[in-house]
Amino acid sequence: MKFELLNQVNLKKDHEIRIYSTCIGCTQCVRACPTDVLEMVPSTTCKAKQVVTVPRIEDCVGCKRCESACPTDFLSIRVYLGGETLRSMGLAY
């Protein structure tokens, strides 16, 4: 399975949220978010015909509850804080 980046939203230089093509449109991450940052939008990339998006990034507190709620093997939504991005993707040297 190919993991494509669907959306990347940067709040600050050191804080970003990435949405991957493995999103199945289940809404678990949306329901888990304590600050209502996420919402579902129509899409043809999954069977549920919807994927998550991040319209209110400025309200993200970096709690990563959306990651914990994601049922896919390859987390469809990831929150990166600081230098965490390269390390967590196995790309740091």
Swiss-Prot record:
**What GO cellular-component annotations does this UniProt entry give?**
chloroplast thylakoid membrane; photosystem I
Keyword Translocase set for record: no
Kindly list the cofactors needed: [4Fe-4S] cluster
Q: Where is the 4Fe-4S ferredoxin-type domain?
A: 13-43, 50-80
Reactions this protein catalyses: reduced [plastocyanin] + hnu + oxidized [2Fe-2S]-[ferredoxin] = oxidized [plastocyanin] + reduced [2Fe-2S]-[ferredoxin]
Q: Which Pfam families match?
A: Fer4_7 (PF12838)
Q: Which UniProt keywords apply?
A: 4Fe-4S, Chloroplast, Electron transport, Iron, Iron-sulfur, Membrane, Metal-binding, Oxidoreductase, Photosynthesis, Photosystem I, Plastid, Repeat, Thylakoid, Transport
Q: Binding positions for [4Fe-4S] cluster 2?
A: 33, 60, 63, 66
Q: Which GO terms describe its biological process?
A: photosynthetic electron transport in photosystem I
Q: Does the keyword DNA-binding apply?
A: no
EC number(s) given by UniProt? 1.97.1.12
Note the topology in the membrane.
Peripheral membrane protein
Q: Name where it mostly resides.
A: plastid
| Oligomeric and partner information | The eukaryotic PSI reaction center is composed of at least 11 subunits.
Biological role stated in the UniProt entry: Apoprotein for the two 4Fe-4S centers FA and FB of photosystem I (PSI); essential for photochemical activity. FB is the terminal electron acceptor of PSI, donating electrons to ferredoxin. The C-terminus interacts with PsaA/B/D and helps assemble the protein into the PSI complex. Required for binding of PsaD and PsaE to PSI. PSI is a plastocyanin-ferredoxin oxidoreductase, converting photonic excitation into a charge separation, which transfers an electron from the donor P700 chlorophyll pair to the spectroscopically characterized acceptors A0, A1, FX, FA and FB in turn.
Q: What is this protein called?
A: Photosystem I iron-sulfur center
What's the name of its gene?
Answer: psaC
